[in-house]
């Protein structure tokens, strides 16, 4: 009987010590958030801000005691903030690299990642530019500096130098261009302009007839069009072809359907990277984005959801 009593006391003390360690960790971190309440900050590549803002607004409306504050920055800084413990959630265009994951594990963390959506990189040009089709090969030659004038791509064009416009030197769009289009090589075009944010890219292209901007497709949709078939009317969106010689017949714009069936070549995955040992609000928000409601928000915004079934219907158009 005495041994049994001592065993119960020992187990009780062990549980109490475990709880004290957990509580002390929370106090040290200064965090009081739960899965669906509290206040946290998270980092996101700025190119994803339109869709993340929609998710955030609905999440906070659904969970009235939760507040998730976005820090919109470039992808490199967002991941750095996560690795350095400044945030527990980062929204990026790539998964953890193995050395990043191992670095966190070596510090006794348990990093997690999940794909939450698919979007596309869109090429935008000035309304005065009538060159509507471009191939992946052409894009590669522009970014590598082999093609520096519009006449190099479109013989006879008088538009002069090709000015390539990105949102930020360390953004996810630049990383995609270097990793997926240039095969891991840096952009060497002599005429590259890096602005501070995506909205500035659109403004620059609107005012510059010989510019070509590279942005995330979630910035394109006209908010007045619930079908997501109308792009921003102040710029032109180019059709992109996998075939070396682009024509209207083999080139596609970043509509959902062409992203879904693989015709549009410049698609990418949006990731939620987590390093949250407390499994609090960062987990709650990222799981909301992955939920049916969160995935429907993504679908309605013109992007492709990761979860759920997508139904394709043929529509017959008649002129009455």
Predicted regions and their residues:
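Serine/threonine-rich low-complexity intrinsically disordered regions
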Residues: 1-7, 97, 149, 291
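Exported/periplasmic ABC-transporter solute-binding proteins
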Residues: 23-64, 68-71, 75-76, 80-83, ...
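Acidic, polar ligand-binding/catalytic clefts
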Residues: 91-114, 242-252, 257-258
């Amino acid at each position: 009987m005495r041994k049994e009593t001592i065993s119960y006391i020992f187990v009780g003390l062990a549980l109490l010590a475990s709880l004290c360690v957990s509580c002390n960790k929370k106090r040290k971190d200064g965090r009081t958030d739960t899965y669906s309440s509290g206040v946290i900050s998270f980092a996101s590549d700025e190119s994803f801000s339109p869709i993340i803002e929609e998710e955030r607004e609905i999440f906070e409306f659904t969970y009235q005691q939760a507040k998730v504050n976005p820090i919109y920055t470039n992808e490199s800084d967002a991941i750095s903030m996560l690795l350095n413990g400044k945030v527990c959630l980062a929204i990026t265009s790539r998964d953890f690299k193995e050395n990043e994951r191992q670095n966190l594990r070596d510090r006794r963390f348990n990093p997690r990642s999940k794909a939450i959506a698919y979007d596309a990189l869109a090429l935008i040009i000035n309304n005065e530019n009538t060159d509507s089709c471009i191939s992946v090969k052409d894009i590669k030659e522009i970014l590598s500096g082999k093609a520096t004038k519009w006449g190099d791509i479109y013989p006879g064009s008088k538009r002069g130098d090709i000015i390539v416009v990105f949102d930020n030197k360390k953004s996810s769009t630049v990383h995609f261009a270097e990793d997926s289009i240039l095969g891991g090589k840096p952009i060497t075009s002599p005429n590259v302009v890096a602005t501070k944010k995506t909205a500035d890219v659109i403004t620059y292209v609107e005012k510059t007839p010989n510019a070509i901007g590279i942005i995330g497709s979630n910035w394109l949709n006209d908010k007045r069009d619930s079908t997501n078939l109308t792009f921003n009317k102040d710029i032109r969106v180019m059709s992109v072809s996998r075939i070396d010689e682009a024509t209207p017949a083999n080139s596609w714009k970043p509509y959902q359907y062409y992203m879904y069936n693989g015709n549009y070549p410049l698609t990418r995955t949006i990731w939620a990277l987590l390093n949250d040992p407390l499994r609090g609000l960062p987990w709650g928000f990222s799981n909301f984005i992955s939920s049916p409601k969160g995935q429907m928000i993504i679908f309605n915004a013109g992007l492709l959801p990761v979860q759920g079934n997508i139904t394709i219907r043929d529509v017959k158009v008649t002129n009455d």
